[in-house]
Amino acid sequence: AGNKRPIWIMGAMVNAIKDIXDFVNLGANNIEK
């Protein structure tokens, strides 16, 4: 059950990837830290 929780998080991240692309352009490389 605990392992299923992070799964939905990854799904949200996939959708956020499009926004992340814009964030990277803004210089949000620090997000990796």
Curated annotation (Swiss-Prot):
**What post-translational modification does the entry describe?**
Contains 2 disulfide bonds.
Cofactor binding remark: Binds 1 Mg(2+) ion per subunit.
The reactions it catalyses are: an N-(acyl)-sphingosylphosphocholine = an N-(acyl)-sphingosyl-1,3-cyclic phosphate + choline; an N-(acyl)-sphingosylphosphoethanolamine = an N-(acyl)-sphingosyl-1,3-cyclic phosphate + ethanolamine; a 1-acyl-sn-glycero-3-phosphocholine = a 1-acyl-sn-glycero-2,3-cyclic phosphate + choline; a 1-acyl-sn-glycero-3-phosphoethanolamine = a 1-acyl-sn-glycero-2,3-cyclic phosphate + ethanolamine
User: Chief location of this protein?
Assistant: secreted
Q: Where does Mg(2+) bind?
A: 32
Q: In which tissues is it expressed?
A: Expressed by the venom gland.
Q: What's any GO biological process attached to this entry?
A: lipid catabolic process
GO terms for MF: lyase activity; metal ion binding; phosphoric diester hydrolase activity; toxin activity
Which GO cellular component terms, listed alphabetically, does the Swiss-Prot or TrEMBL entry include?
extracellular region
Its annotated function is as follows: Dermonecrotic toxins cleave the phosphodiester linkage between the phosphate and headgroup of certain phospholipids (sphingolipid and lysolipid substrates), forming an alcohol (often choline) and a cyclic phosphate. This toxin acts on sphingomyelin (SM). It may also act on ceramide phosphoethanolamine (CPE), lysophosphatidylcholine (LPC) and lysophosphatidylethanolamine (LPE), but not on lysophosphatidylserine (LPS), and lysophosphatidylglycerol (LPG). It acts by transphosphatidylation, releasing exclusively cyclic phosphate products as second products.
Q: Which family does it belong to?
A: Belongs to the arthropod phospholipase D family. Class II subfamily.
- What's the name of the protein? Dermonecrotic toxin LiSicTox-alphaI-1
What is the species of this protein? Loxosceles intermedia (Brown spider)
